[in-house]
């Protein structure tokens, strides 16, 4: 830590608050450099954190955390927060098995008020915490930091609408690191922000309100005049003022002096406050500033050169999906691709560039994405919703009410199904089979390799009803790709004939199942379809084998294995059944391989579980 003389002194925000204000720019420089060095050695989210260094320092300097409670939305930008709150020496373990969590996590630190990972939850939770604090006369400040992407979600506006109506004391900070909201940042804005947040202006404002309460017409006129003054400087301010917030900004989020002055003023204000700051994602590191998307989440890399490692492995399942999407769009102009702010992650970059008129990025709006697809289907188009398993949870009612009940031809391409790995419990795709298979009219498929994935996407696209294909994060296995053709719906594939034991595989754990089958001389069936199930195959296996083993990368509760048991129970087969899958717990972070091994879903673990079951059976 000899390169970080001030940062090495900071083991908690209390240490930070002992420093002089004129030392804070150096703290910011050291913090940014330390963040860059540590993430380059471990992997993780980089660009967002580089952009919030000054804000993080200012917040912990002005507010008495953890008594004053700081809530980060999503949490990608919270690495500097972790470094300043006693976890500096453990940053090399972030996102690793048994290491510190990739996002703010209540169990990890008293400074992490809300466990996060999904977007747009901070203001709702912050409002609840603020209401509780007011009821207890706690006297603490509640601060929510939300990005310009997360604030586009409906939940954020629902919370602000409620907070404005209640007039609850809380501060919402919009970290605006894109050009989409406002470009008005400069000396004038910083100066006006000090005025609007200052004690003199605020006192006059509050006193005037009390006087004007007896004169409603004049009060309304003055309110509109104030809103207009702010609106001239920042047109977006009118929206937040109408929601009941006192809007300040935008100000330069990298000017530590202005942040300190403005936050000091706003700390004393009553009611819902809104501070708009402008930052640059990747600030201070040229490669990240030039490519903030590429440096959003990074593997280990050489930060001196800024070169990210190039993958020489087989294509990812996301890439396989993207290639299928382009191939299909070439033949069908009725195809419409939809993503809720996951263009890069879902493999849709090429599609969006080649077919811009057939592509919609609806931002962080999963509910809207699904119902938009329903409307397009009603209009005669063939929508494909590309969405992560963990984010599909946010649109569950829309899948049922707007798609399935109406039996509309919408294809859900469910990425990141199963174990995702380093992002931990909030991002594992553990539940989609369980919450989807109970929905009538829905066809659900789980490919065992990239060729099967293509064929299933094609089958779902052509079936004329709601369909879902779930596939994992990461690289495919390198099998040869066939020309597109439709699979027979509800029919499985016998992969290996054995005796006594039959492994019914759902998804990409098939290679592990085959390894085990060679040792145990087991039959292996790639089930392909979770819904409708191949009843004929299940009945045949139950009659000719002593033990059925279901294998899936989904929680066992309510998953594909449970569906097999339902079939066996209805037919009253006398056969032993072992369900292998994810446990009834939230699965922690680690590499995919580490997590599968720990859950005994690698080949060795599967064999061990089957042998233990056979001893009991």
Curated annotation (Swiss-Prot):
Record pathway: Metabolic intermediate biosynthesis; 1-deoxy-D-xylulose 5-phosphate biosynthesis; 1-deoxy-D-xylulose 5-phosphate from D-glyceraldehyde 3-phosphate and pyruvate: step 1/1
GO cellular component assignments: cytosol
Cofactor: Mg(2+); thiamine diphosphate
GO biological process: 1-deoxy-D-xylulose 5-phosphate biosynthetic process; isopentenyl diphosphate biosynthetic process, methylerythritol 4-phosphate pathway; terpenoid biosynthetic process; thiamine biosynthetic process
Binding site for Mg(2+): 148, 177
Keywords tagged on the record: Isoprene biosynthesis, Magnesium, Metal-binding, Thiamine biosynthesis, Thiamine pyrophosphate, Transferase
Ranges in coiled-coil conformation: none
Chain residues that bind thiamine diphosphate: 76, 117-119, 149-150, 177, 285, 366
Cofactor mode of binding and number, as noted: Binds 1 Mg(2+) ion per subunit. Binds 1 thiamine pyrophosphate per subunit.
InterPro entries the UniProt entry points to: Dxylulose-5-P_synthase, THDP-binding, Transketo_C/PFOR_II, Transketolase-like_Pyr-bd, Transketolase_BS, Transketolase_C, Transketolase_CS
E.C. designation(s): 2.2.1.7
Listed PROSITE patterns: TRANSKETOLASE_1 (PS00801), TRANSKETOLASE_2 (PS00802)
UniProt cross-references to HAMAP family, sorted A to Z: DXP_synth
Assembly and interaction partners: Homodimer.
Role, per record: Catalyzes the acyloin condensation reaction between C atoms 2 and 3 of pyruvate and glyceraldehyde 3-phosphate to yield 1-deoxy-D-xylulose-5-phosphate (DXP).
Similarity field: Belongs to the transketolase family. DXPS subfamily.
Name the UniProt record assigns to this protein: 1-deoxy-D-xylulose-5-phosphate synthase
Species for this entry: Mannheimia succiniciproducens (strain KCTC 0769BP / MBEL55E)
Primary gene name: dxs
């Amino acid at each position: 830590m000899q390169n970080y003389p001030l940062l090495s002194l900071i083991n908690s925000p209390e240490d930070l608050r002992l420093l002089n204000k004129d030392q804070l720019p150096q703290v910011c420089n050291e913090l940014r450099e330390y963040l860059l060095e540590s993430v380059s050695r471990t992997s993780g989210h980089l660009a967002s954190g580089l952009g919030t260094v000054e804000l993080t320092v200012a917040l912990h300097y002005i507010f008495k955390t953890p008594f004053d409670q700081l809530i980060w939305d999503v949490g990608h930008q919270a690495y500097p927060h972790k470094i300043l709150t006693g976890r500096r020496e453990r940053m090399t373990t972030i996102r690793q098995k048994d290491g510190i969590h990739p996002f703010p996590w209540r169990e990890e630190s008293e400074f992490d008020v809300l466990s996060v990972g999904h977007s747009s939850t901070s203001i709702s939770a912050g409002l609840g915490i603020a209401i509780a604090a007011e009821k207890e006369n706690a006297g603490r400040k509640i601060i929510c930091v939300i990005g310009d992407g997360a604030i586009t979600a409906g939940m954020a506006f629902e919370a602000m609408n409620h907070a404005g109506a209640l007039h609850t004391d809380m501060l919402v900070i919009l970290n605006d690191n894109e050009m989409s909201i406002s470009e008005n940042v400069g000396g004038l804005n910083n100066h006006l922000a000090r005025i609007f947040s200052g004690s003199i202006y605020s006192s006059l404002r509050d006193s005037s309100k009390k006087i004007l309460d007896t004169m409603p017409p004049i009060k309304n006129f003055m309110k509109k005049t104030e809103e207009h003054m702010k609106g001239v400087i920042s047109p977006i301010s009118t929206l937040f003022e109408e929601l009941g917030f006192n809007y300040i900004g935008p100000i330069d989020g990298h000017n530590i002096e202005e942040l300190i002055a403005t936050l000091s003023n706003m700390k004393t204000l009553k009611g819902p406050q809104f501070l708009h700051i402008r930052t640059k994602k990747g600030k201070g590191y040229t490669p990240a500033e030039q490519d903030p998307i590429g440096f959003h989440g990074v593997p280990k890399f050489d930060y001196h050169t800024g070169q990210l490692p190039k993958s020489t492995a087989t294509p990812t399942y996301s890439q396989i999906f993207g290639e299928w999407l382009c191939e299909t769009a070439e033949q069908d102009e009725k195809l419409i691709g939809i993503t809720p702010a996951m263009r890069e992650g879902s493999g849709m970059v090429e599609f969006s560039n080649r077919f811009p008129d057939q592509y919609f990025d609806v931002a962080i709006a999963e509910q809207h994405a699904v119902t938009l697809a329903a409307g397009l289907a009603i209009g005669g188009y063939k929508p494909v919703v590309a969405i992560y398993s963990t984010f599909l949870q946010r649109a569950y009612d829309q899948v049922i009410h707007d798609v399935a009940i109406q039996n509309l031809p919408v294809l859900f391409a469910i990425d990141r199904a199963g174990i995702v790995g380093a992002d931990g419990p909030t991002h594992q795709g553990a539940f989609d089979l369980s919450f989807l298979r109970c929905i009538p009219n829905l066809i659900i498929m789980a490919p065992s390799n990239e060729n099967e994935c293509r064929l299933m996407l094609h089958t779902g696209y052509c079936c004329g009803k709601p369909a879902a294909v779930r596939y994992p994060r990461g690289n495919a296995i390198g099998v040869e790709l066939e020309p597109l053709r439709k699979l027979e719906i509800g029919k499985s594939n016998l992969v290996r004939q054995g005796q006594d034991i039959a492994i019914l595989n759902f998804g990409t754990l098939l290679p592990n199942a085959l390894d085990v089958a060679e040792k145990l001389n087991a039959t292996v069936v790639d089930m392909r379809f979770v819904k409708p199930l191949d009843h004929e195959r299940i009945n045949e296996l139950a009659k000719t084998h002593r033990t059925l083993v279901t294998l899936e990368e989904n929680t066992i509760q309510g998953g594909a294995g449970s569906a097999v048991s339902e079939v066996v129970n209805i037919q009253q087969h006398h056969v032993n059944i072992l369900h292998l899958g994810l446990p009834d717990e939230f699965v922690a972070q680690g590499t995919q391989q580490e997590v599968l091994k720990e859950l005994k879903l690698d080949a060795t673990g599967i064999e061990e579980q089957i042998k233990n079951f056979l001893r009991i059976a």
